[in-house]
Amino acid sequence: MTPRISLAGALAALCLLLLAPWPALAADPTSISAITVTTNGQGQQEYSVSLQILLIMTALSFIPAFVMLMTSFTRIIIVFSILRQALGLQSTPSNQVLVGLALFLTMFVMAPVFDKINSQALQPYLNEQIPAQEALQKAEVPLKAFMLAQTRTSDLELFVRLSKRTDIGSPEATPLTILVPAFVTSELKTAFQIGFMIFIPFLIIDLVVSSVLMAMGMMMLSPLIISLPFKIMLFVLVDGWALIIGTLAGSFGTV
């Protein structure tokens, strides 16, 4: 069984776990157990099922922020948006298409990281081999490694200095409250650098078309109308989508 299949099975089991108690609770409202926290023989805290469900439902509200700020999604969606502007297309591809493509490309890029989280943290927790707190700590390790690999040292040092923390001995010990903004800042810089390189060939086409129209005295004709077919043709001839998607996926170094 592959890690991805096991992850899908784990999510399905989690959904069944969340839905199963509701008929019984509706039949007997007094059977709802109190939220309890107990300490086992090893000194570790264990949470009741009710508290675990509450924590899971609370964590679900942070999924959009997690996807946007702790994965490759930010760089990918910004590059796609700049590409659409460079082509001169205001609404094609639509926002829904760009976001969907960015999400699936993010899943592809982050698959090695998610596989490590599944094998090192999620599966041991679901098998009751480790407590929830230890599972969260183990899940942070591959995620931090990914973000540190994409974060510039100058950006990380900036936020460490702003936080006035002096107890951080190594980049791996950086807390997420400092690492995440540093990672996002680096991702924005990288996305704009890639976007600048994408703009150059299309900008040259716009300048050439504008110069030709000016020489012909057709100043009332918008250069965008004439240059748009040439830009689309150039993008198709060089297999632009495969080139950009392949470059984006390879820029993270995880695939």
Swiss-Prot record:
Membrane topology (UniProt): Multi-pass membrane protein
Top-level taxon of the source organism: Bacteria
Localization of this protein: Cell membrane; Bacterial flagellum basal body
Parts of the chain that traverse the membrane: 7-27, 53-73, 97-117, 194-214, 232-252
Gene Ontology biological-process entries: bacterial-type flagellum assembly; bacterial-type flagellum-dependent swarming motility; protein secretion
Pfam families: FliP
Keywords of the record: Bacterial flagellum, Bacterial flagellum biogenesis, Bacterial flagellum protein export, Cell membrane, Membrane, Protein transport, Transmembrane, Transmembrane helix, Transport
GO cellular component, as recorded: bacterial-type flagellum basal body; plasma membrane
Predominant place of localization: membrane
Keyword Transmembrane helix: yes
Keyword check for rRNA-binding: no
Known role: Plays a role in the flagellum-specific transport system.
PANTHER family: FLAGELLAR BIOSYNTHETIC PROTEIN FLIP (PTHR30587:SF0)
Similarity section: Belongs to the FliP/MopC/SpaP family.
Name assigned to this protein: Flagellar biosynthetic protein FliP
Organism: Pseudomonas aeruginosa (strain ATCC 15692 / DSM 22644 / CIP 104116 / JCM 14847 / LMG 12228 / 1C / PRS 101 / PAO1)
